[in-house]
């Protein structure tokens, strides 16, 4: 997997001097206990760092500026243990540029019925201290996540952990580099977009490179490295019999190994974590990258076909949110309109990530009718089952829109022996008819990122961090209400 920098999350507790030094010592002690307990829980992907109990406007502003300056700090979690007058927070919140989570909790889970007194009441005031803090966030229009519940509750911890992954994806987004090999597929609209606007909005650096640059990297790959990678293929995948002996099929597989090694070297040298290819720009290459792309996605790279750089970047960020699990570039390919069992078959020409596979992938070689190159090797498999999301990022000219459809992947009821690509079947929520109608009304692309591991909540959180629109299609969606939502959003986003 692609490595991430050692991110951390800062925990900042709000209070004030009204209650005396002894109370502040208890607030700090409780905060340290919470952080220590969290850091022992493997559910959290990154460590918490307790920064301080802040009690003055100067302390609050200082810690916010320090968070901005720290490359390790991916987000700030705040909690008001006691009442913390929120005017003190204005200066700091005006400065803060890192993702913010407001944890509405309290140290004790239960009220100590027999011993509760006013000392206890004054110390444990988050029930109204956090409401005061919440007001100033609303008054200032601060983008923040609010999580409510006891800090030891597994559900609360799970929500915190998912937000942490999303915040790290946002941090990675600010430095994400996309390499485009060739241009977009000719005459296609949705894969186009404003690359300068994307860099301003998300931080993405998107640049094009000639196929000849990549071809040279491929040619520089040694036969020893190719042979070592072929051995790895044989350990991980089933390979068609013709691919296990010398001949054209094995040579096709060897070529994909060569492409994988050359492509990976190019990406590593340029610090790219996402890339695109297109079958219309392959001069000097023997095959369209297939198996090579699938394996690089499995390592955490983002990918988009036909020059789709927005989806390539989205795949990379969702890989980060998912910790590399169960996430792939995808395309809505064809429909099954059987009444009561409507399905979508998702696939692509070659490039579906094996992290969503339910079966052991099989390396096969088949002709590709477009691109005019040799028969490419690819991994063929059926996708898994379970709840998932499909997400699409589009450029509407004056803003970006993230569209999310919740789906349920299902096991194929029939074999598809003549279909030479990786594939997955799903039932979109609320139905194929309504989801497709809503998707089309929203302008959703035919390319998506499909994920078993990323949740709708994470994608909504990312949109909030990035300052973009997000619309969700799920079991509660009605097309008439969705149309109104799109109209209301148009007014809101044009007015910002």
UniProtKB/Swiss-Prot annotation:
Residues annotated as signal peptide: none
EC class: isomerase
Enzyme Commission identifier(s): 5.3.1.4
Stored InterPro entries: Ara_Isoase_C (IPR024664), AraA_central (IPR055390), AraA_N (IPR055389), AraA_N_sf (IPR038583), Fuc/Ara_isomerase_C (IPR004216), Fucose_isomerase_N/cen_sf (IPR009015), Lara_isomerase (IPR003762)
Record GO terms (molecular function): L-arabinose isomerase activity; manganese ion binding
Keywords tagged on the record: Arabinose catabolism, Carbohydrate metabolism, Isomerase, Manganese, Metal-binding
Gene3D superfamilies, per the entry: 3.40.50.10940
Name used for this protein in its record: L-arabinose isomerase
Protein's organism: Geobacillus kaustophilus (strain HTA426)
Gene label: araA
């Amino acid at each position: 997997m692609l490595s991430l920098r050692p991110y951390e999350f800062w925990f900042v507790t709000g209070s004030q001097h009204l209650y005396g030094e002894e109370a502040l010592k208890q607030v700090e002690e409780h905060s340290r206990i919470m952080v220590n307990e969290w850091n022992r829980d493997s559910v959290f992907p990154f460590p918490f760092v307790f920064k301080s109990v802040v009690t003055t406007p100067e302390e609050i502003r200082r810690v916010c500026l320090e968070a901005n300056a720290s490359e390790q700090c991916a987000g700030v979690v705040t909690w008001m243990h006691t009442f913390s007058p929120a005017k003190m927070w204005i200066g700091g919140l005006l400065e803060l540029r890192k993702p913010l989570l407001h944890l509405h909790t309290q140290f004790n889970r239960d009220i100590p019925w027999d011993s509760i007194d006013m000392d206890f009441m004054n110390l444990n005031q988050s029930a109204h201290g956090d409401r005061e803090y919440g007001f100033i966030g609303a008054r200032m229009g601060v983008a923040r996540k609010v999580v409510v519940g006891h800090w030891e509750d597994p559900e609360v911890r799970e929500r915190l952990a998912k937000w942490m992954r999303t915040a790290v994806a946002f941090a990675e987004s600010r430095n994400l580099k996309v390499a485009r090999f060739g241009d977009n597929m000719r005459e296609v609209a949705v894969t186009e977009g404003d690359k300068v606007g994307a860099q301003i909005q998300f931080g993405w650096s998107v640049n094009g490179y000639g196929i000849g640059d990549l071809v040279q990297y491929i040619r520089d790959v040694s036969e020893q490295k190719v042979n070592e990678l072929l051995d790895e293929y044989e350990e991980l995948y089933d390979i068609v019999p013709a691919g296990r002996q010398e001949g054209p099929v094995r040579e096709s597989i060897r070529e994909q190994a060569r492409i994988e090694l050359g492509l990976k070297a190019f990406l590593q040298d340029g610090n790219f974590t996402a890339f695109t290819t297109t079958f219309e720009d392959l001069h000097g290459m023997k095959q369209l990258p297939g198996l090579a792309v699938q394996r690089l996605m499995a390592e955490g790279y983002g990918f988009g076909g036909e020059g789709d750089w927005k989806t390539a970047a989205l795949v990379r960020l969702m890989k980060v949110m998912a910790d590399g699990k169960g996430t792939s570039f995808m395309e809505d390919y064809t429909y099954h309109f059987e009444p009561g069992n409507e399905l979508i078959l998702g696939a692509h020409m070659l490039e579906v990530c094996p992290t969503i596979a339910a079966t052991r992938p099989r390396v096969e070689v088949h002709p590709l009718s477009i691109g005019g190159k040799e028969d490419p090797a690819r991994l063929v498999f059926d996708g898994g089952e379970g709840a998932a999301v499909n997400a699409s990022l589009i450029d509407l000219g004056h803003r970006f829109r993230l569209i999310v459809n919740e789906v349920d992947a299902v096991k194929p009821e029939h074999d598809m022996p003549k279909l030479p690509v990786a594939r997955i079947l799903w039932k979109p929520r609320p139905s194929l008819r309504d989801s497709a109608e809503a998707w089309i009304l929203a302008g959703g692309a035919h390319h998506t990122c499909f994920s078993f591991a990323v949740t709708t909540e994470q994608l909504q959180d990312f949109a909030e961090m990035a300052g973009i629109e997000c619309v969700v299609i799920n079991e509660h969606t009605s097309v008439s209400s969705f149309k109104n939502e799109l109209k209301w959003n148009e007014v809101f986003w044009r007015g910002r």
